[in-house]
UniProtKB/Swiss-Prot annotation:
Enzyme Commission code: 3.5.1.18
A GO BP entry: L-arginine biosynthetic process
Name of this protein: Succinyl-diaminopimelate desuccinylase
Organism: Pseudomonas syringae pv. tomato (strain ATCC BAA-871 / DC3000)
Amino-acid positions noted as binding Zn(2+) 2 in the UniProt annotation, renumbered to this chain: 107, 142, 356
Gene behind the chain: dapE
InterPro entries linked: ArgE/DapE_CS (IPR001261), Bact_exopeptidase_dim_dom (IPR036264), DapE_proteobac (IPR005941), Peptidase_M20 (IPR002933), Peptidase_M20_dimer (IPR011650), Peptidase_M20A (IPR050072)
Pfam families per the UniProt record, alphabetical: M20_dimer (PF07687), Peptidase_M20 (PF01546)
Binding positions for Zn(2+) 1 per the UniProt entry: 73, 107, 170
Length: 383
């Protein structure tokens, strides 16, 4: 069934946003809708279009006192085969089971709607609140993420903007809304390793150097290496090879080089420099002719128990009756950029069971629960 007009304000806004096909980095006027609502609520608006990416920064309150920022993204991943969906992925339907179906329902237009409605209600109820309520919204989270939150944070840092606490609306929950929040993320360090050999005929191996044979022991050692033990907040650092390419396709040619793509998801117990040095030592130990191109996607960050995590946890408890679990599992998020400002960052959003899948969906009523959790958190920190 199509979402009826008598839905809650949060669900009405969520459906409006989902119906806008904002496949990364296209915003499809989602931010126009959000800025109009925030402007009407008295927020100061600052659009920041950077290259082909739409972003905005919005604030309500004074420069004196703490700042609580809601952060999120309007872009979504591609739908995949439309014919495999139970409905058009941009129709925003609520089915007979009460599930809100559509691309972005969980990741993360539902959260955006809940944040905005909670903030509207809070500034109406507490017009003279402490500090500031802020929004940092981008259309470049699901893509390269070069001109989105990262670029906005760089601008905010350059002018010494204060940002004490941040709630990122990523879908953190696993079974029930609020059962898990993310209080940190592992770092992500990628690499493209090239091992050079010498091309030749398979019948004359003495005239060639097979990079597959040469590199295999080193790759096996890298895969077996114990990088660290993790800690109370993070599991041990992991190393995974994702791609191996070598050869011409012919059966009688020894290849001239091998390319391996691998990734570290690393804890706060390891550093970028330390991991790079240990990789180099292993490759040199095996006397390889090698080169590595490194790509750092993000450093690990952690928000330890304190004002933000306490406020979020107690709000979840008061609204749902549930105790929440703080976790650092999963991939990277834009929280990694915001944390560089020294900000306490917590991710809290809907159930993530169907994110990036065909028939992405969440329980529609969860968005009203999420709205109340966000509202109560605002009250605890800024009222």
């Amino acid at each position: 069934m199509t979402a009826p007009a008598d839905l809650s304000p949060t669900l009405q806004l969520a459906c409006d946003l989902i119906r806008r096909p904002s496949v990364t980095p296209v915003d499809a006027d989602c931010q126009t809708v959000m800025m109009q609502r925030l402007g009407d609520a008295g927020f100061k608006l600052e659009p920041m279009r950077i290259e082909d990416v739409d972003n905005f920064w919005a604030t309500h309150g004074t420069r004196e006192g703490p700042v609580l920022c809601f952060a999120g993204h309007t872009d979504v991943v591609p739908t995949g085969p439309v014919q495999d969906w139970q409905n058009d992925p941009f129709d925003a339907l609520i089915d007979e089971h009460g599930m809100l179906c559509g691309r972005g329902a969980a990741d993360m237009k539902g959260s955006l709607a809940a944040m905005l409605v909670a903030a509207e209600r809070f500034v109406a109820d507490h017009p003279d609140h402490k500090g500031s309520v802020a929004f940092l919204i981008t259309s470049d989270e699901e893509g390269p993420a070069h001109h989105g939150t990262k670029a906005v944070v760089e601008r905010l840092a350059a002018r010494n903007e204060r940002l004490d606490w941040c709630i990122v609306g990523e879908p953190s929950s696993t079974t029930l809304v609020g059962d898990v929040v993310k209080n940190g993320r592992r770092g992500s360090l990628g690499a493209k390793l090239t091992v050079r050999g010498k091309q030749g005929h398979v019948a004359y191996p003495h005239l060639a150097k097979n990079p597959i044979h040469l590199a295999t022991p080193a790759l096996a050692e890298l895969a077996a290496e114990h990088w660290d033990n993790g800690n109370d907040f993070f599991p041990p650092t992991s190393f995974q090879i994702s791609n191996l390419n070598s050869g011409t396709g012919a059966t009688n040619v020894i290849p001239g080089d091998l390319v391996a793509v691998f990734n570290f998801r690393f804890s706060t117990e390891s550093t970028v420099e330390g991991l790079q040095q240990r990789v180099a030592a292993i490759l040199d130990k095996h006397e390889l002719d090698w080169h590595v191109d490194w790509a750092l996607s993000g450093l690990p960050f952690l928000t330890e128990p304190g004002a933000l995590l306490d406020a979020v946890s107690s709000s979840i408890k008061s609204v749902t009756g549930r105790d929440t679990k703080a976790s650092t599992s999963g991939g990277t998020s834009d929280g990694r950029f915001i944390a560089t400002l020294g900000t306490q960052v917590v991710e809290l959003g809907p159930v993530n069971a169907t994110i990036h899948q065909v028939n992405e969906r969440i329980l529609a009523s969860d968005l009203d629960v999420l709205t109340e959790i966000y509202y109560q958190t605002l009250v605890k920190l800024l009222a």
